[in-house]
Amino acid sequence: MNVRAIVAWTLYDFANSAFAAVIFATIYAAYYALAVVGNDGGAGDLWWGRVVSVSMGLVAVTSPFLGGVADRAGIRRPLFIGFTALAVTATALMSTVAPGMVVWGFVLGVLGNFAYESALVYYNAYLPDLAPPSHQGRVSGWGFAVGYAGSIAALLAALPFVKAGNYAGAFFATAALYAAFSLPAFFMLPAPPSGRVPVLRAAREGGAQVVATARRILALPDLRRFLGAYFIYEDGVNTVIAFSGIFAAQTLGFPMERLIALYIVVQISALIGALAWARPTDVLGPRRVVMITLCQWAAIVVAAYFVQTQGQFWALAVVAGTGLGAVQAASRAFLARLAPPGMEAELFGFYSLCGKSAAVMGPLVFGGISHAAGGNQRAGILAIGSFFVVGLALLSRVKAGGKAPRVASS
């Protein structure tokens, strides 16, 4: 294994986790819903749900097509760099969003999250190039663990600005961290073969390739079943991440400083979860690890419905963090285990398609139920539990994902 490339790959997880933590999960999410929109009657929940759903929908439509183009034309790296730069730019521009600027904040939220998620398609596709199947679980776990450390660093960097009421400074600091720690990946990750197909020709053939890939997935039962299950349960994970900060601030009265501290504690527990489950993912198989953590997630959202105090929510958040690290790392390793050679970028495009198109529904469900209930977020969070239960039932039908190194294509 190329140690330098693996280090650069994990540092990118450190970088993009700044966006995930500060923008998507805590500061910008709460600032937009509560200050920019105002959450009277659940209006902020509804608008933030639209930000998440529209951006994820764009990723769902484009990611498999762009993944196919990357494989055929050998332009994975330029697309990876370009989408990262777009996400960094959108993050910096969030400093211009003031209370009442609902549409501008919506546009930047959609643009930033779309670019962030699109870059992840190419980032994830590097995993089979960096490690053999027997080590992909632990390398994936290392990446998520370093990513959680990046979340903590970004929140600590933003905290002084938030305490001073300088949200613009917090967003600028996040953009700077995102850019700086992305640079090693730009230069050290292995370059795929270039010039196999001209870019324009690859673009013309991309649509046909997407259809062909879909048919090939349908012909591989375990791959098809895994992606179907992932479609459902990742919807629940993304929705909880998108709304947990707003739920804590609105329903339980967390101030912004305490919300940041809460998220840091969650990241520490998630880091522990990712590291603790890295080797068991290889030994037990990613299928079993994902199923265990889905049971954990279902119990967590039910418990969240009944939480009444901030102390209870602190305890629940720690438990949720360990499950977050495990389910994300094991799911990525699961797909790497199932991906036939030569289809990695395209299949990770479908991986993103399943997770992000499903996330179109979850945020709309939460926001819609909260708004219909006059701002009662407890009903919304309880409804998300169904995504974990259904995902678990579907995943139980997947036979692969144990100790076998890779499922052969047919």
Report residues per predicted region:
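Juxtamembrane intracellular "pre-TM" segments in multi-pass secondary transporters
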Residues: M1-V7, P192-G228
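Short amphipathic helix-loop junctions that connect adjacent transmembrane helices
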Residues: A21-D45, A242-L259
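A membrane-interface helix-boundary motif in multi-pass transporters
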Residues: G41-D45, P160-A176, G368-F388
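Helix-to-loop junctions at the C-terminal end of transmembrane segments
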Residues: V61-I75, I272-P286, S370
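Structural signature of the two symmetry-related core transmembrane helices
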Residues: P78-L93, R288-A303
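Hydrophobic core of transmembrane alpha-helices in multi-pass small-molecule transporters
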Residues: A90, M101-A119, Q312-A326
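Glycine-rich segments within core transmembrane alpha-helices of 12-TM secondary carriers
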Residues: G137-A158, S352-G362
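Multi-pass alpha-helical transporter architecture, strongest
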Residues: A180-M188, L382-S410
